[in-house]
Every structure is written in structure tokens, then in C-alpha cells.
């Protein structure tokens, strides 16, 4: 006889991307902190985003060891989009390739929070990094959006950047927050979009676990989520399985847990 964990409901497996802030109140992620995190929750983490400018801010030797620890646990690392945007502003995008390779980071995020890329330029950079064996994630949206997201526009961008070589699209947290306040029906339509499995939705670490439980309730246990603080990764997996007050211990009523 064995006693097993409750399973996630539905098909597939939603992805989890943590955001590695470095030493921070959201979860210490120095070398030993990352090793402890991965020993406990590594099996539930797919990606680790190296926060903002940390590829430059954190000394290279310890950061390389952190990246190597993630790689050993089969967690893919990628640099945050702010680093790309800064390099683009400085006219030094190509300098990212040797910097990231030297650190062992094999992925990067391309975003447009504080810069604008025309579609041809965006797709060219995605292809440029793919040709150099980087995995590329594109982030859709801005940190201060002016109006609710247009699903047709988002769908077109997902299709275009996937064709250019991006393997996933992250939807900026601020875009989701604005939609939730102004027209939550858009989120219901988003869940039915044929390209929904190609995106990760950013969550707000400061709104854990309420917002995360709400996203699971709205999109299902296998929704792919990004921006997860390291200290929240294990509890998030519990929420996905119906464990915790945030989901009212739905493991006891599995028929009520969204697929």
C-alpha cells in the first residue's frame, strides 16, 4: 500500500518559472539557497529567470555557480528582458551573447517594457539569438499599459514570435492586472484561445497566494505561471494539487478543481 499526493487535474503539465531576485526577502537565492530550493522543489520548477540586471549586478563567479546548480536540476535559466532592453538602448545587443554564454545562461527574454521594437526588428533579434543556440522567451506587454490587452493582437504576436523562434511568450503581469480590473471577461476568452498553451502568465509575488489561487481557479491547475518567487514554488505546486487554504483544500473535492 502507498499513500500518494493528490494529482493535478486535467491534461498536460503547467509550467512554473521562478524569478531569481538574488539575495532578497522573497527568498534567498545565493548559491546555498538555490541548492536548498532545488533539493526541495526542483522537480516542480521549469525555468529560473535571472532578475533584471543581475547578470551584470551579481559577481560572475557566484552567479555561474547558481546557474550551474539550476542546470544540474534540469531547470532552464534565462536572463530578464530588462537586460535586453538596456543592451538595446546602449546599442550593444550582440554583447549579450558572450556575456550570457560566459555565465552558462542559455536563454534570454526579449521584452518591450521601456523600448519599442518594430516587428521586423523584434523577429530579427529572436532569430539572431536562436541562431546562436539561445532559447528565447518573448514578453508581451508593458509595465504601465494604457488600455486592456487586445486578444487578436496578442494572438498575432504569439504566432509571429513563435514562427521567428521564440519557444514561449510571457504575458506581463501589469496587462493581466489591468484586464482583471476593467474587463475580466477578456481573461475567460484568453483561456479558450488556441495558442493559450504557448503562453505563461505572470503573477505578482506580493499577492501570493490569493492571486495565484485565483489564476488556478480561472485557468485550471495546469496554467503556466511566471514570476514565482523561489519561496513560493513549493506552495504553488500544492495549490495546483488542491492543497492549501487558498484553494479551500480542493483535493477533497477533486470534481470541483478546474481542469
Provide a role label for each language-model segment.
Residues 13-21, 45-50, 75-81, 108-110, ...:
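Hydrophobic faces of well-ordered beta-strands that scaffold small-molecule active sites
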Residues 12-32, 51-56, 78-92, 139-153, ...:
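Active-site mouth loops of central-metabolism enzymes
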Residues 30-32, 55-69, 86-96, 112-134, ...:
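Active-site-adjacent beta->alpha loops and helix N-cap segments on the catalytic face
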Residues 1-7, 19, 29, 52, ...:
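N-terminal and secondary-structure boundary signal
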Residues 37-41, 70, 99-103, 129, ...:
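Generic structural signal for hydrophobic
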Residues 1-67:
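Conserved N-terminal beta1-alpha1 strand-loop-helix module at the mouth
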Residues 52, 103, 107-114, 160-178, ...:
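Glycine-rich phosphate-binding active-site loops on the catalytic face of alpha/beta enzymes
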Residues 7-11, 194-259:
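C-terminal alpha-helical cap/extension of soluble enzyme domains
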Amino acid at each position: 500500500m502507498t499513500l500518494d499526493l493528490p494529482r493535478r487535474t486535467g491534461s498536460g503539465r503547467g509550467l512554473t518559472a521562478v524569478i531569481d531576485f538574488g539575495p532578497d526577502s522573497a527568498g534567498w537565492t545565493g548559491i546555498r539557497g538555490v541548492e536548498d530550493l532545488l533539493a526541495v522543489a526542483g522537480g516542480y520548477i521549469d525555468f529560473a529567470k535571472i532578475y533584471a540586471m543581475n547578470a551584470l549586478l551579481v559577481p560572475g563567479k557566484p552567479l555561474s555557480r547558481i546557474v550551474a546548480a539550476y542546470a544540474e536540476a534540469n531547470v532552464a535559466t534565462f536572463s530578464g528582458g530588462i537586460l535586453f532592453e538596456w543592451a538595446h538602448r546602449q546599442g550593444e545587443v550582440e554583447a549579450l551573447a558572450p556575456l550570457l554564454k560566459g555565465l552558462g545562461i542559455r536563454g534570454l527574454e526579449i521584452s518591450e517594457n521601456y523600448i519599442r521594437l518594430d516587428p521586423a526588428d523584434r523577429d530579427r533579434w529572436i532569430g539572431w539569438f536562436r541562431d546562436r543556440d539561445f532559447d528565447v522567451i518573448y514578453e508581451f506587454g508593458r509595465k504601465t499599459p494604457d488600455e486592456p490587452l487586445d486578444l487578436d493582437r496578442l494572438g498575432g504576436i504569439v504566432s509571429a514570435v513563435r514562427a521567428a523562434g521564440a519557444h514561449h511568450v510571457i504575458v506581463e503581469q501589469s496587462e493581466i492586472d489591468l484586464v482583471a480590473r476593467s474587463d475580466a471577461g477578456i481573461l475567460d476568452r484568453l483561456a479558450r484561445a488556441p495558442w493559450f498553451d504557448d503562453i505563461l502568465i505572470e503573477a505578482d509575488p506580493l499577492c501570493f497566494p490569493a492571486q495565484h489561487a485565483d489564476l488556478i481557479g480561472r485557468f485550471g491547475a495546469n496554467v503556466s505561471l511566471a514570476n514565482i518567487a523561489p519561496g513560493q514554488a513549493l506552495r504553488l505546486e500544492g495549490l495546483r494539487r488542491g492543497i492549501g487554504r487558498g484553494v479551500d483544500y480542493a483535493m477533497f473535492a477533486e470534481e470541483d478543481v478546474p481542469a
